[in-house]
Amino acid sequence: MKRTFQPSVLKRKRTHGFRARMATANGRKVLSRRRAKGRARLSA
């Protein structure tokens, strides 16, 4: 059976990266929530 997680750095960055988050209003909300929580890493 094929596993669900097939790692790809490019796909990871494009979907969950900082610039992807900044591109949308909701993505910016995600970043602000993570800043408020005090996360060391904001995005992938």
From Swiss-Prot:
GO molecular function, one term: structural constituent of ribosome
The keyword Ribonucleoprotein belongs to this UniProt entry's keyword annotation: yes
PROSITE patterns: RIBOSOMAL_L34 (PS00784)
Region: Disordered, residue numbers: 1-44
GO annotation terms (biological process): translation
One GO location term (cellular component): ribonucleoprotein complex
Keywords: Ribonucleoprotein, Ribosomal protein
Domain of life according to the entry: Bacteria
Biased composition (Basic residues): 10-19, 30-44
PANTHER family documented for this protein: LARGE RIBOSOMAL SUBUNIT PROTEIN BL34M, MITOCHONDRIAL RIBOSOMAL PROTEIN 34 FAMILY MEMBER
Similarity comment: family membership: Belongs to the bacterial ribosomal protein bL34 family.
The protein's name in its UniProt record: Large ribosomal subunit protein bL34
Source organism of the structure: Saccharophagus degradans (strain 2-40 / ATCC 43961 / DSM 17024)
Species classification: Bacteria, Pseudomonadati, Pseudomonadota, Gammaproteobacteria, Cellvibrionales
Gene: rpmH
